[in-house]
Amino acid sequence: EGCAILVEDSGLFIDGLGFFPGVYSSYVSRTIGNQGIINLLEKNSNRQAEYRAYSILYENGKYWNSMGKCSGQISTEIRGSNGFGFDPIFIPNSGDGRTFGEMLQSEKDAKSHRGKSLRILCDNLRAPLK
C-alpha cells in the first residue's frame, strides 16, 4: 500500500513490413538493428511507420493508462547518433526531415510517442476518477 507502479512499453510498426517489428521491436533492434530494417525495406516503397507507446500507472487498486503515437517514415540510411534503438532511422512526420537520432533530446521528447503517452497519462491523473 502506498506504492505506485509505472510501466511503459513501446514498439515500431512499419506498414511495408506488415507492421513488423511491433511487439518484437526490442529483440529486432538487438539482433538485426537499424541496418537490418533498412535492408528489409530495400525493395519496398512503403516506408510509412508508427511508433506507439503505452503507459500504465497502478496505485492502491486503481490504474490509469494512456497511449501515444508518432507517425513517420523509415529513412534509407542511418542518420544521427542521438537516442537509441530505431531513432537513427525514424523520421517523424511532424518534424523537419531529421531522424530522431539527429535531434536533441528535448526536440525528440516534444514529438515522440513516449512523450505523448506520458503527457496524456499526466492529464488523466489530473482528471477526477469515475
Go through each PLM region and give its residues.
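Anionic-ligand binding patches
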Residues: 1-130
